[in-house]
Regions:
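Phosphate/dinucleotide-binding and metal-coordinating scaffold of catalytic cores
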Residues: 1-178
Length: 178
């Protein structure tokens, strides 16, 4: 498996990163923060250590970053805090809600079931286009010279359930769309 490390510059360090006042007055900040919160909810983010959610200090592009997402999906419970595994914001981007409502179960399984595939050939390993899921019950799968990485069918079902919950709550009027 591969680990990637990328240093983020011009981001907040430490402390509470969610600024409710800014969220209510700056639509670009609100969009970035709401989209990140939707993602952390969908992936069942369970590592709220200080520094795992960062905001850009660039006022013209107030992006939000979530890092160290190793304790997600069906990971065992963590004592690291889980405040971002819930939707904490009250306003969501309409474009994001529309996109979530257009997703089908088939699309989720197709895109998330096999996220990466590798083949061993001639003493080398190469990234190749994903093929049919070898075993939907496992996240890491091997068959012959093929290795696949992706979410399990159970994890994808949990993602689908969380998306449907957001959409249901939206229909009930829980969120203001912008």
């Amino acid at each position: 498996l591969v680990m990637i490390q990328y240093w983020l510059n011009e981001v907040t360090v430490g402390g509470e990163v969610y600024n409710k006042k800014k969220f209510n007055s700056d639509s670009l900040y609100a969009k970035h923060f709401a989209n990140t919160n939707i993602m952390t909810y969908i992936i069942n983010h369970q590592d709220s250590n200080e520094g795992n959610l960062l905001t850009s200090t660039d006022e013209k592009n107030p992006r939000v970053f979530t890092v160290d997402n190793g304790v997600t999906f069906s990971s065992p419970k963590s004592n690291r805090g889980a405040k971002w595994k819930y939707i904490r914001v009250k306003r969501l981007p309409k474009k994001t809600i529309d996109r979530l409502s257009s997703l089908t179960s088939e699309q989720l399984h197709e895109k998330m079931g096999v996220i990466a595939q590798f083949e061993f050939a001639d003493g080398d390993i190469k990234s190749v286009d994903p093929t049919k899921n070898i075993n939907p019950n496992k996240g890491v799968r091997q068959e012959g010279n093929v290795i696949q990485l992706g979410l399990t069918a159970k994890e994808i079902k949990a993602v689908e359930k969380k998306i449907n919950y957001i959409l249901k709550q939206n229909k009930k009027g829980k969120y203001e769309l912008f």
